[in-house]
């Protein structure tokens, strides 16, 4: 179906779509002003054949519709959380505590090496989410963006479910819950049950006591299951990428250096696949790791590999058990 055919089919709804887009932009702007933090990491879209083998990998592209749904979803979650907080009934909130002060100081010290700064509350080592937001805006498009974004994310505490409404640091809001996906998340389903009982006038003292008894364990168990699901998703994605690159051993690709460590350099390809060139496979010189600038430097030649640098690689091998991909520099890169 072509674009024009789609436009004709939904012609009556088009004005509403544009109104939704306008409202979503206002909501996003409002969240940004209060300091909401958006870690925009590239996501992978992996296409599989009937046997579950990966046949294509590409970056997942967000569009206007994606943003509209997200903005409306966030508002619905905030509204429901605030409404039921003031009703003073047992509930399951989605909370995100303030970052650990030590991790914030470590982040501040690290980004200082690259000329970036965040304002930390004196004496308490606390940071406002707006400072993290400003940092992410500053590094956007810079060579250090991926590294600093990952380190900033690691300095944050993990969001969790709780019966206490303690606020959400990342969204810079006081009230938040997960309400919009009862078909795939248990906390949402639990919330819908509470709402239905309240709407139907059945949330009497006996039912309130029931929820008071079970919701703490519901929140704890849901948080634990979420962590397990996230870990499984990450491991599965890594495995599918390894399987995808297995049939491409010996092929060359252009990529960008996404990480530098004492043991090698990581290179990310345009399709989001990442592999490592071990330091022992950097030929032509003895390379050492310059920690303060995250660079790999040749002792004799002074040749330098740094974050954001474009390089051409050859897929050297994969390890399905370790879920790792090994690259080597393409011959033309070594000759430079």
Residue ranges and their predicted role:
Residues 1-283, 293, 308, 314, ...:
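Electropositive polyanion-binding surfaces
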Residues 284-305:
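Surface-exposed acidic, glycine/proline-enriched linker/cap segments
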